[in-house]
């Protein structure tokens, strides 16, 4: 559903299940994250997503649409099995334990585009690179013509429980490194700040599958 005041979209049916994964109410978490998503949206004008996982499924908790005339328009496309093909999914996968990764990736890796990494060995190299760099990208791996940047949100045990990603038409960033850097810096800042809030309000950090 859409909150008409904030213009954000939410998956209402997912909130209860997300609350069972973390140690405080999902509404509280999403409400706190909202202004940070809005800030990214204001700075970049691009679509912004707050994501997490439900078992082995990737779920979108909140989304802000792009404000640009030419924009990414994918709404709530089904990303349940797209952990390996999205910046939001890979940003979490790269920092999970090996056991959690294997559980999520045990099935067939669906190929969404010609750029989707659906080979486990190649994906492993990609996740190692993400772990080293601290962020993930999706270069037309989920949707043709779309480039995304995603950062993990960590709990007080440095385990990823959510992620923020920003999506842009690829042509806008191909020859504009400054624009890409602006996207990365705004998403990184928000992911860190939201993580700080989680660490202050949650001292258990052991209920999720990271």
Describe each model-derived feature in a short phrase.
Residues 1-5, 10:
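Beta-hairpin "wing" of winged helix-turn-helix
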Residues 63-65, 141, 165:
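Short clusters of small/polar residues that mark proteolytic maturation junctions
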